[in-house]
Amino acid sequence: MAVTGWLESLRTAQKTALLQDGRRKVHYLFPDGKEMAEEYDEKTSELLVRKWRVKSALGAMGQWQLEVGDPAPLGAGNLGPELIKESNANPIFMRKDTKMSFQWRIRNLPYPKDVYSVSVDQKERCIIVRTTNKKYYKKFSIPDLDRHQLPLDDALLSFAHANCTLIISYQKPKEVVVAESELQKELKKVKTAHSNDGDCKTQ
């Protein structure tokens, strides 16, 4: 079963954990050299950040690619090339999950709710956001469903609009909820350092 396959790869990955500023930071190193870093709220175990880093063909470490979490604010000192040109007025896309849903927020979208259309494209395995006034178009996948090899279902998709922000929710299939719960049990077994015990690779 695919869900077990992904969970198994997390179980067998080399893991280090650090408790810092109310967050549990976990660094995974996979046998193929890929790295994943996650940050969880210490009290709720809610996922706050997930990012990936892959080695280049020449063996050099690439940049961290954010999958879940708030993009680094402008002027944060660690700007990626894609953030340098970003204006405060441009739509800002980010993913912030809840316990039961994958959730994305697109800030700086001032149009009323009835202008937006959010749908699943089964063929391309992605979600498409478009506006009737043709001012905005966005296509994005749900890597978690790809990793678990689960289908996308229109019935699990919903969206809301408030304060110039479009909030898109996709209810997590039960297989994902179970796998995430199993992972939390697994992470409890990882020896966790505290921020004053030394550094962690996720820093």
From Swiss-Prot:
Disulfide bond annotation, renumbered to this chain: none
Biological process, per Gene Ontology: determination of left/right symmetry; epithelial cilium movement involved in extracellular fluid movement; establishment of localization in cell; flagellated sperm motility; lateral ventricle development; spermatogenesis; third ventricle development
Tissue: Highly expressed in the testis. Weakly expressed in pancreas, skeletal muscle and heart. Expression increases during ciliated cell differentiation.
Source taxon at top rank: Eukaryota
Family: Belongs to the DPCD family.
Function description: May play a role in the formation or function of ciliated cells.
UniProt protein name: Protein DPCD
Organism for this UniProt entry: Homo sapiens (Human)
